[in-house]
Amino acid sequence: FLRKLIDENLIPDDVKVQVLTQSREHLITKTFEALKGCKNAIVHLYNSTSVLQRDVVFNMDKEEIIGIAVKGAKLIKEEAAKYPETNFQFEYSPESFTGTEMDYALEICEAVMDVWQPTSENKMIINLPSTVEMTTPNRYADQIEWFSKTIKNRDCVSISLHPHNDRGTSTAAAELGLLAGADRIEGTLFGNGERTGNLDILIVGMNMYSQGVDPELDFSNINKIAEIYKDCTKLPIHERHPYVGD
């Protein structure tokens, strides 16, 4: 799919495509091969950081998990240098941020920052996902506010939200997270995602419009967007869905 977009010159000049990779060498290499010839791209690195995943899935201590992140960050920096024709922006996620100790989430993100050396002109994205929605939206916003105020070199970082919808509160979490200091949101069309889904970017965008804030998303042909979505995914949109329901 990505090769089709690049080879057929289907990506507008003002659009960045985003790719997601685990901190594994062969996946990082393949990811950059897929991006060859792309004008603008975000390369998004992630690894699991929560207490549960460290203890049960990886059986690793904190330093070993940081080592995984740093190794991946170095590989991405090395691979990006091989493709000077592409304007890369780097992104890092401590997966399961909401299940991670806040001081440790900060530590691992700053370790990645030390590798990538972002600047105010070339910011890196730090994405703080509620990989499994575990608590109330105000608690998520508290975590975002603390992180935003505590991270070093804040002017060199764009803080991103990635709310899942396990508790049915992803929209509230996203809106409160923005008010708490986040710069960016990741979401999906009509909430399509694993388990109970991810944040519906359309709802947040339309909610922002209703409050006089332009999300810089074009919803002028929202019914056509819905038709294409249903045709491509073979998934229905609930008739009581906000803004696009029947």
What are the residue ranges of the model-derived segments?
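Glycine-rich phosphate-binding active-site loops on the catalytic face of alpha/beta enzymes
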Residues: 180-199
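Short acidic (Asp/Glu) and glycine-rich catalytic loops that position anionic groups and cofactors
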Residues: 124, 182-186, 202-210
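A glycine-rich helix N-cap at a beta->alpha junction
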Residues: 13-21
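Alpha/beta enzyme core
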Residues: 2-12, 25-159, 175-180
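A mid-to-C-terminal "edge-of-domain" accessory segment
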Residues: 212-246
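C-terminal helical cap(s) of enzyme catalytic domains, especially alpha/beta-barrels
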Residues: 193-225
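Short glycine/serine/threonine-rich phosphate/pyrophosphate-binding segments
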Residues: 27-28, 166-172
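Generic beta-strand/beta-sheet core signal
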Residues: 20, 46, 93-95, 127-129, ...
